[in-house]
Amino acid sequence: MAKITKEIVFGNHKLILETGEVARQADGAVMASMNGTQVLVTVVWKKDGGESNDFFPLTVNYQEKFYAIGKIPGGFNKREGRPSDNETLISRLIDRPIRPLFPDNFFNEVQIIATVLSLNPEVSPDIIAMIGASAALSISGVPFNGPIGAARVGYKDGVYLLNPSRKEQEESKLDLVIAGTKDAILMVESEAQELSEDIMRGAMLYGHEMMKNVIKSIEELARDVGKSKPEWKAPEIDTVLKARINDVARNEVEAAYLIKDKQQRYQRLGELREQTISALLAENDELNADVIANMFGELERSIVRNRILDGEPRIDGRDHRTVRPISVRTKFLERTHGSCLFTRGETQAIVVATLGNERDAQILDGISGESRDRFMLHYNFPPYSVGETGQVGSPKRREIGHGRLAKRALMAVLPDANEFPYVLRIVSEITESNGSSSMATVCGTSLALMDAGVPLKAPVAGVAMGLIKEGDRYAVLTDILGDEDHLGDMDFKVAGTEKGITALQMDIKISGITNEIMERALEQALEGRTHILGVMNNALAEHRTELSQHAPRITTMKVAEDKIRTIIGKGGATIKGLIESTGVSIDIDDSGVIQLFSPDKIALEEAQKQIKALIAEIEVGQTYQGKVSKIVDFGAFINLLPGKDGLLHISQICAARTQKVEEVLQEGQEIEVFVAGIDKQGRVKLEWKDKPQAEAKEVEDAPVSATFLTMEEQSEEINSGNKISEEEE
């Protein structure tokens, strides 16, 4: 196939889609480029074998190559390894809008691989990868009801920004990624700084409108390639069997969905499913048990959806707008820094906040460069939370995605590092789940952080919205259950403060979501969020004024840059000595900011005291308790401050000209001295403050000039006695 190229004006950028030159043995391959960022996206699908599957085996792998930015990977092997969290999240970003566009009952294996080959740091590759995946699918011949487009939308000074650069994004109050077909929005992922519902809705509509030009160009590319799609027909529905299942099971299934307890309801539905399969196989042993089970599921879906659309109570008895009962317990765990048990209906999370110092920040080494993450949020979904057995270990894609959504919801309200210098780690342990566990994590995180004494700018709550739509009839549901998510048409999660939205995630399974439906969903989400915030504020309205007794303390000091070397010492000896003697963790940066970290308040105060002494300057007219550090023929050097000595002249020590300094003072002896002066060369002249009067008189009467050398005459000796030599500096 000859090389085919499409150039698309996309905001301030030019998007280029190319096929026919690279990866020609894949069913579909597109090189998507934008201002120096290039992503190769390939699609391969199996033409048969789907009959043996009862699910759709779609796999999306997004991978970043370090050579794309001219870097060599770190680590022992010096090659790319397991996917980073960012790669996993972008894989999900590609997967979510395209998965609903494959036909029902299409179970053939499909694999999409997106590889970043070249990276301009100012142009994010995620949008390019999403568009490339859409184009590759459209030319692959796989049954696909696309194409889709994708766009990133920012918001600054009342203006929406299309595909902002990284620099522009840093100044934006919104980071919204949207994907959809020319007729409908399918997926939204966003982080915002407390923006209103109207601004968020406007951003979605703006992004959807802007991507239509991309969709049109992909359609043209597919026509130019001209690959014919193989005949694929969905299996014919056995209407007789469907009617028979309805006759056998409908009444019992309707009754089962009146059981409000999830586990009891699931147990009863499982029994009914097995009874139905057994009864129908007894009537006709040629029937397929899996087909019967799938049709039984369709019956469940029909019953639940029609009941809601008819205005009847939902599965757990609520109306469309009511939030499930909520209970909150802060200080749930005794020795953690902050904790919360958040329960909403049959969804429950133990959320724990831990405070650390700068050394605990997570180092992220990706192709965009190394960075440090001061706020980590880890979401765990153990199998017992849904009454099942399963593997426990590394987080799965879903856990990484849910954790990132909850993290995004809190980013807008975190205190600045100079106001609260702690590194924060949140762990959310989902102990029960029946829908919206990510939003329970948002609520629990806000409470756990405030319980730990973190001064959040405002509390944050989240709620998951659902949709049931048949023709022109629809119902928007607040705080959906797991079954309502599974059997419904939309999962729309909204988190925010009383002031506005901080995070929004939407996945839609159908086309035709109107502006009216979106407006209704946002309005109900605000109502639900406000209610949840009220319950949370009744439990803990503001952050605790004192940190937990088990939490470490951080003190920050600022010193002049020319004092950094003094604190560190030769080969780090001084700072190591401070750390060993006090047990305090000490970090100092190039600007002179020192961070002291310890669970022991007394140790912190001691470390501060020692550092202040290290950088303190000797002042004329002040009295110091010094220690004799060195005795010389013409006097004694007295250590006043760490690394700083002064000279106590022999005339201030000895009463007679025949007396030696060693007869009066010994090294290590402590005496009180007065700083009489400091000359231009920085030499410190001392007087012995508590020298006996008799000795003082005798010294005054003695011909000092004939017996002792003056300070000026001993300048070389004085300089040689300084504690910090030029070599040490």
Swiss-Prot record:
Quote the catalytic activity from the record. RNA(n+1) + phosphate = RNA(n) + a ribonucleoside 5'-diphosphate
Primary location recorded for the protein, binned into one broad class = cytoplasm
Q: How does it assemble?
A: Component of the RNA degradosome, which is a multiprotein complex involved in RNA processing and mRNA degradation.
Q: List the record's Gene Ontology CC terms alphabetically.
A: cytosol
Species of the source: Legionella pneumophila (strain Lens)
The KH domain, residue ranges: 552-611
Gene coding for it: pnp
Query: What is its subcellular localisation?
Result: Cytoplasm
List each copy of the S1 motif domain by range. 621-689
Task: List, alphabetically, the CDD domains matched.
Answer: KH-I_PNPase, RNase_PH_PNPase_1, RNase_PH_PNPase_2, S1_PNPase
Q: Report the EC number(s), separated by commas if there are several.
A: 2.7.7.8
Protein name per the record: Polyribonucleotide nucleotidyltransferase
One GO BP on record is:
mRNA catabolic process
Q: Name one GO molecular function term.
A: RNA binding
**Pfam families recorded for this chain?**
KH_1, PNPase, RNase_PH, RNase_PH_C, S1
Q: Tell me the first and last residues of the signal peptide.
A: none
Q: Which keywords label this protein?
A: Cytoplasm, Magnesium, Metal-binding, Nucleotidyltransferase, RNA-binding, Transferase
Please describe what this protein does. Answer: Involved in mRNA degradation. Catalyzes the phosphorolysis of single-stranded polyribonucleotides processively in the 3'- to 5'-direction.
- Family matches, as SUPFAM superfamilies: Eukaryotic type KH-domain (KH-domain type I), Nucleic acid-binding proteins, Ribonuclease PH domain 2-like, Ribosomal protein S5 domain 2-like
Q: Which cofactor does it need?
A: Mg(2+)
Q: Which residues bind Mg(2+)?
A: D485, D491
Q: Which family does it belong to?
A: Belongs to the polyribonucleotide nucleotidyltransferase family.
Q: What class of enzyme is it?
A: transferase
Q: Which HAMAP family match?
A: PNPase
